[in-house]
């Protein structure tokens, strides 16, 4: 049996079904991987609910780590028996084994566990492109990072500290703020008790920040724009509170010639060479100790419904994985 989590209709976590789906043999440019652990991310929720529409029925999951069982013709960068990890389209990582394109499958160093590998690829490479591929950031710059105690946020806190970048985080409780501070945030604002826009201005002496990195979406968008200094960059890379509504682009000029972008990881890792380079950079950060991967929750694959419920209810900190 090859347990695989699929959805046949969009909706709540009750739409997650475990079925037996044969993995098959890899074709040209493909590999078959026996998974040891799978990562859980908010994009999986977006896909399950239909916010990011998929053709149905569809297996879910965007990242995992495991061992290569078979390789197809033309695959040269990994071989049978290699430890690997990936974050990649198409979805389908919530399973015991799968056949998938090899281009975004990355050799996993022995120093990094399968659990860490499954927990870090999508979130870690997201941080890599946010700090190195979206807008130039230099030592001494200041970043406002929403959801700083989540999986992406805790990696970002550590990454920023390792590169001399001041990170101001936001989180929904004092406990989560302390977690962000413990991982390298210079400041963290509890948005349930303080107005983050006003607090950012206070912390920056009225200047604002160079860059905002926002995965929350609708509820933080306006305040994020108002937290930027003139010529600042707004990076909106998620919609946890709902999608950003349409707005008048003239606001960007009125607020100080601001810039805005809506990147996705899968554009950045679309080329094999870029993906492998980004993964090597991430692995080096982890092996050096600059970044520690915090796995806050582990669920068995059979408990995927409970895992989604915890993620949507914002009861999670750090990364969440499914063990196989």
What are these regions (language model features)?
Residues 22-39, 49-92:
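Glycine-rich beta-strand-centered segment in the early N-terminal region that forms part
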Residues 86-147, 159:
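NAD(P)H dinucleotide-binding glycine-rich loop of Rossmann-like/cofactor-binding domains
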Residues 147-148, 216:
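NAD(P)H cofactor-binding loop motif with strongest signal on the N-terminal glycine-rich segment
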Residues 152:
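Hydrophobic/small residue at the entry helix of a nucleotide-binding pocket
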Residues 161-220, 271-273:
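Adenosine-nucleotide cofactor-binding segment
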Residues 163, 219-290, 324:
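Glycine-rich phosphate-binding loop and adjacent beta-alpha segment
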Residues 272-324:
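C-terminal hydrophobic helical "lid"/dimerization subdomain
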């Amino acid at each position: 049996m090859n347990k695989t989590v699929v959805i046949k209709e969009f909706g709540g976590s009750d739409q997650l079904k475990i079925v037996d789906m044969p993995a098959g043999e890899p074709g040209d440019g493909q590999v078959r991987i026996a998974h040891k652990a799978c990562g859980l991310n908010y994009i999986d929720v977006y896909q399950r609910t239909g916010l990011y529409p998929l053709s149905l029925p569809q297996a879910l999951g965007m990242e995992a780590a495991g061992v290569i069982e078979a390789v197809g013709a033309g695959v040269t960068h990994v071989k049978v028996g290699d430890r690997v990890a990936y974050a990649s389209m198409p979805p389908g990582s919530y399973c015991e084994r799968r056949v998938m394109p090899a281009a975004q499958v990355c050799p996993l160093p022995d120093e990094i566990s399968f659990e860490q590998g499954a927990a870090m690829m999508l979130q870690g490479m997201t941080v890599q492109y946010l700090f190195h591929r979206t807008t130039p950031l230099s030592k001494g710059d200041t970043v406002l990072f929403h959801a700083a105690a989540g999986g992406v946020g805790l990696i970002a806190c550590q990454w920023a500290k390792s590169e001399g970048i001041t990170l101001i985080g936001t989180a929904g409780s004092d406990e989560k703020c302390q977690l962000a501070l413990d991982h390298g945030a210079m400041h963290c604002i509890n948005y349930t008790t303080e107005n983050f826009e006003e607090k950012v201005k206070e912390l920056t002496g009225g200047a604002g920040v160079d860059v905002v990195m926002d995965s929350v979406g609708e509820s933080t968008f306006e305040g994020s724009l108002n937290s930027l200094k003139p010529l600042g960059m707004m990076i909106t890379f998620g919609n946890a509170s709902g999608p950003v509504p349409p707005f008048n682009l003239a606001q960007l000029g009125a607020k100080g010639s601001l810039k805005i972008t809506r990147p996705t990881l899968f554009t950045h890792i679309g080329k094999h060479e870029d993906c492998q380079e980004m993964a090597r950079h991430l692995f080096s950060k982890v092996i050096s100790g600059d970044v520690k991967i915090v796995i806050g929750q582990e669920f068995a694959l059979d408990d995927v419904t409970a895992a989604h419920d915890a993620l949507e209810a914002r009861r999670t900190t750090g990364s969440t994985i499914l063990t196989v």
